UniProtKB/Swiss-Prot annotation:
GO terms for cellular component: extracellular region. Belongs to the long (4 C-C) scorpion toxin superfamily. Sodium channel inhibitor family. Alpha subfamily. Binds voltage-independently at site-3 of voltage-gated sodium channels (Nav) and inhibits the inactivation of the activated channels, thereby blocking neuronal transmission. Has the structural arrangement of an alpha-helix connected to antiparallel beta-sheets by disulfide bonds (CS-alpha/beta). This is Neurotoxin LmNaTx15.1. Its main location: secreted. CDD domains: neurotoxins_LC_scorpion. InterPro entries: LCN-type_CS_alpha_beta_dom (IPR044062), Scorpion_toxin-like (IPR003614), Scorpion_toxin-like_sf (IPR036574), Scorpion_toxinL (IPR018218), Scorpion_toxinL/defensin (IPR002061). The keyword Chloroplast does not apply. Residues 1-19 form the signal peptide. Pfam families: Toxin_3. It is found in: Secreted. One of its GO terms (biological process) is defense response.
Amino acid sequence: MNFFILIASACLVLTGVQCRKDGYLYDSKNCKYACVDNDYCLKECKSKGGYYGYCYRWYSSCYCEGLPDKVKTEKTGRCTL
């Protein structure tokens, strides 16, 4: 049993498993990407490596799905304009 777990873990490491996440896009000033239409957000999300993006109208912000882990999707401080 332990051998099977070891082999499975090694296969995952060797294949380069990539984790994906969903969230709002933030710029370098900790501000969300503002939007008015889905096309803009789709373009921005894809440029960051995401699968899909849309304008979440309630917050007027771009929401992305399938982003790489390295992309900032959480606010880390105050938005400075």
